[in-house]
Structures are given as C-alpha cells and as structure tokens.
C-alpha cells in the first residue's frame, strides 16, 4: 500500500508573478510527488473556484494562504493513511470535505495541487513514469499517442496589451512525422515570425503565453502575417501546417453582440459565426476555440451547423471541463471538441471523466495549459496517457511553456513507436 504519511502545501509564484498553490504528498518508503495549480486569465464563469485571500495589502489580494492552510489542515487530516494509488477515492474524499458545487470551501487550486501530487507520488511508488500511471487510472494501460501541438505564436485579447481582439493565433504542424519534428517546425515558424514582424517595424514583445503581441489593423492581418512567416520558414500552409484560433469570444461579448473593438466591428451571434467561416475560406484554419460566448447556446448551434462538419469547434469556456455541461453539449450537438483544463474542474479523476465522455461521444480532446503557469509539466503526461491527440501549451518561448514541450520530447524518446504522432488525423473534420 502506498500509504500517505504527510501532505504539505505552500504558496509559490506563477508565470505572471501571482501566487499559486503547490503541494507535496509523501508516502511510506520515501516516495514523494509534488505538483502546482495553474491559473487562467480568460476564465469561464462556471469554472471551479480558485480560492484567493482577498487581502489587498498582500499580492493585491491574490495571495493563496487560505488554500495552503486548507491543504495543511483539512485535506491533510482527511487523507493521512490513505492509499495514494486509489486516486478516485482520494479525490472523492476531498470533494466531500469541500461539500460545495464548485469547490469554494477548500478551493479548486488546493484540491487540484494535492490530486496531482498524489498521482505523482503513486507513480513513484509503482516505479513507473507519470504517463503510465495516468493511463492505468484511465483504464487504457499501454495505449499512448503523441499530441499535435497548438502553438500560440501571436497573442491578443486578455493575453496581451494590444489591439488584437482574437486571443490566440496558433499553428499546428500536422505534416510532421514525429512530435520532435513538429516542435522543430513550430520553433522555426516562431523565429521566422519574429523576423517578419521586425521587417514591418512591429513589436516583438510577447504576451502571457510567449506569442508575439503586435498592434495590427485587423484580426485577418494576423493570419496574413503568419502565412508569410510559415512560408518564410520553408513550409506550406494547409499541408505542412494548419492554423487554429482561440477567439475567447466571451471576453468581447457585450449586450448580445460581439464587439471587435480593435477593428471597429460589431456582429450578431450568427454574423460573427459567418465572419469566422469567411476566415476559414481564406486561410487553412482547422480549429476554432470558443468562437462564441459561453452562454450563447443558440449561436453555438448555428456555428456548429455551418462549420462543424469541416472545422474543429472547441468548447473551453463553453464546457469548462465539466461533464454535466459537456453532456448537455453532446445531447444538443453543440461543438465537436473539448478543451481540457485541470483547474476548471479541480481534480484528476474528474478531468479523466470529462476526457472519456468526450471521446465516447466522438468529440476530439485538446489538453491545455493556463495563461498563468508554472514549471509543472503534468499536462504533457496527461496528453500522452489519454491519447488525447492534441495539446495547447503556448509558444516556443518562456520556460513555463517550453517545460511541457521538453517533457513531451522525453516521453517520445522513452516510448518510441509505442506513441505514434498522427498529425492531421487527430483534428476533427480534417482526417
């Protein structure tokens, strides 16, 4: 038995200079797991609660000492002596101790940090890599694939201080034969984009996720510049590389309309979907995330109707990694893909349940970071362990992003042909 003998919580810093929660789970025999909770900027209103202290005299109210206290007190007391390999039991105990719908007593950040740390401790106890242990928990032992990365090379919206409304413009190296090759392609395009921006006298400062954040005349201009950068790097758009957008449309949804203030345009729900469809006809965009507000279900139905057979439509704020909300989407034919973020739901067990539900319904799965990240690379192992097929973890810049890519390189090296890179086949509507 992987008996838990101690749990330690602490306050650490995330990639935006804000506090976040880290936890250690210690087992008999000297085994230990450590994990940190990430934090989002554009957040869905139905996400599990990230517990902050609210003390304006300390970290502008963003301290997490209450969450840390919950780890060192209530959570530690509840889990002492339990078996770390019994992940579902541990997570359920924490959920029961919390006793609220959205984890606002203990904090999803506290529960998640302990949940992931316990999984890492259990993997250490079993003497296996984390991805192997997660695959066991998922009921898919030995079944792996390497994810196609969504690389956020140009930032707007809440992730950058510029006038670009769409939050993320991403490249997916679908023509690569391996993850290692995909990473190289993305890095070359990233550096190519920097030189293109410089040649136009545009800013090469970066946003929260490491993508460039220039002021541009329109959102379409961002796509045009990326096209130039892809070709300058020696690749063909549409075959070697496809494009992906994260609109984060909830951030510019006002009074029932979509306000692209950066270019002075206002759209109805159907009008904005038509606008996005027109972009897919001009550029090889294979995936669009949060193309409408999280509450605009009628708009989502229209968007899915006009694009869902050819374009991957990813629900992030729409589904918030929540099986109850995802089931409603599946039942109503809304979107065709889900973005998976640990901290939206708050435990590993609930995360795996959302992945299984999506896959069983024929939805694709994209494992994702948050804009406020740490060096914790657990999402890399999760993507491989569940054969998710896609991962979204930022640009080829900033070590909080690159840490995940580097972990994927290590995993691919270990697994070799046991973890194929399937390219375009992983993206809904593109196979």
Curated annotation (Swiss-Prot):
Gene Ontology molecular function terms on file: magnesium ion binding; phosphopyruvate hydratase activity
Subunit architecture: Component of the RNA degradosome, a multiprotein complex involved in RNA processing and mRNA degradation.
Main enzyme class: lyase
Binding site for (2R)-2-phosphoglycerate: 167, 341, 370-371, 392
Database matches in CDD domains: enolase (cd03313)
Designated name of the protein: Enolase
Reactions this protein catalyses: (2R)-2-phosphoglycerate = phosphoenolpyruvate + H2O
Name of the gene encoding the protein in the UniProt record: eno
InterPro entries: Enolase, Enolase-like_C_sf, Enolase-like_N, Enolase_C, Enolase_CS, Enolase_N
Pfam families according to UniProt: Enolase_C (PF00113), Enolase_N (PF03952)
Pathway: Carbohydrate degradation; glycolysis; pyruvate from D-glyceraldehyde 3-phosphate: step 4/5
Co-factor: note: Binds a second Mg(2+) ion via substrate during catalysis.
Function recorded in the entry: Catalyzes the reversible conversion of 2-phosphoglycerate (2-PG) into phosphoenolpyruvate (PEP). It is essential for the degradation of carbohydrates via glycolysis.
GO cellular component: cell surface; extracellular region; phosphopyruvate hydratase complex
Family under the similarity heading: Belongs to the enolase family.
Source organism, top-level taxon: Bacteria
Annotated source species: Shewanella halifaxensis (strain HAW-EB4)
Subcellular location(s) of the protein: Cytoplasm; Secreted; Cell surface
Primary subcellular site in the record, as a coarse category: cytoplasm
Keyword RNA-binding assigned: no
Residues that bind Mg(2+): 246, 289, 316
Swiss-Prot/TrEMBL keywords: Cytoplasm, Glycolysis, Lyase, Magnesium, Metal-binding, Secreted
Catalytic residues in the record: 209, 341
Cofactor requirements of the protein: Mg(2+)
Entry EC no(s): 4.2.1.11
């Amino acid at each position: 038995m992987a008996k838990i003998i101690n749990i330690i919580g602490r306050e650490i810093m995330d990639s935006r200079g804000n506090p976040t929660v880290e936890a250690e789970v210690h087992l008999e025999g000297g085994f230990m797991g450590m994990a940190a909770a990430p934090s989002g900027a554009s957040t869905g209103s139905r996400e599990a609660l990230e517990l902050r202290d609210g003390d304006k005299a300390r970290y502008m109210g963003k301290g997490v000492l209450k969450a840390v206290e919950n780890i060192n007190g209530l959570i530690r007391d509840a889990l002492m002596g339990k078996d770390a390999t019994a992940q579902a039991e541990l997570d359920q105990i924490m959920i029961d101790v919390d006793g609220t719908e959205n984890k606002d007593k203990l904090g999803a950040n506290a529960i998640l940090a302990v949940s992931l740390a316990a999984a890492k401790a259990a993997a250490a106890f079993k003497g296996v890599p984390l991805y192997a242990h997660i695959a066991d928990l998922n009921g898919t032992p030995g079944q792996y694939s390497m994810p196609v990365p969504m690389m956020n090379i140009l930032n707007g919206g809440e992730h950058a201080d510029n006038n670009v409304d769409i939050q993320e413009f991403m490249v997916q190296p679908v023509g690569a034969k391996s993850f290692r090759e995909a990473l190289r392609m993305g890095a070359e395009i990233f550096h190519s984009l920097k030189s293109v921006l410089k040649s136009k006298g545009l800013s090469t400062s970066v946003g929260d996720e490491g993508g460039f954040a220039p002021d541009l005349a329109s959102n379409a201009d961002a796509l045009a510049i990326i096209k130039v950068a892809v070709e300058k790097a020696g690749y063909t758009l549409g075959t070697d590389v496809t494009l992906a957008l994260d609109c984060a449309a909830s951030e510019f949804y006002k009074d029932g309309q979509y306000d692209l203030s950066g270019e002075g345009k206002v759209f109805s729900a159907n009008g904005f979907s038509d606008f996005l469809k027109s972009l897919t006809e001009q550029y090889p965009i294979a995936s669009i995330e949060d193309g409408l507000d999280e509450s605009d279900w009628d708009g989502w139905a229209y968007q899915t109707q006009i694009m869902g057979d050819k374009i991957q439509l990813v629900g992030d704020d729409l589904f918030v990694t929540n099986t109850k909300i995802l089931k409603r989407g599946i039942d109503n034919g809304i979107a065709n893909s889900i973005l998976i973020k640990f901290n939206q739901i708050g435990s590993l067990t609930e995360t795996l349940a959302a992945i299984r539900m999506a896959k069983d319904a024929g939805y694709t799965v994209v494992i994702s970071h948050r804009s406020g990240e740490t060096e914790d690379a657990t999402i890399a192992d999760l993507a491989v362990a569940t054969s998710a097929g896609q991962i979204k973890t930022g640009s080829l810049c900033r070590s909080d992003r690159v840490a995940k890519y580097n972990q994927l390189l290590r995993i691919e090296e270990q697994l070799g042909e046991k973890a194929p890179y399937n390219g375009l086949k992983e993206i809904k509507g593109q196979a």
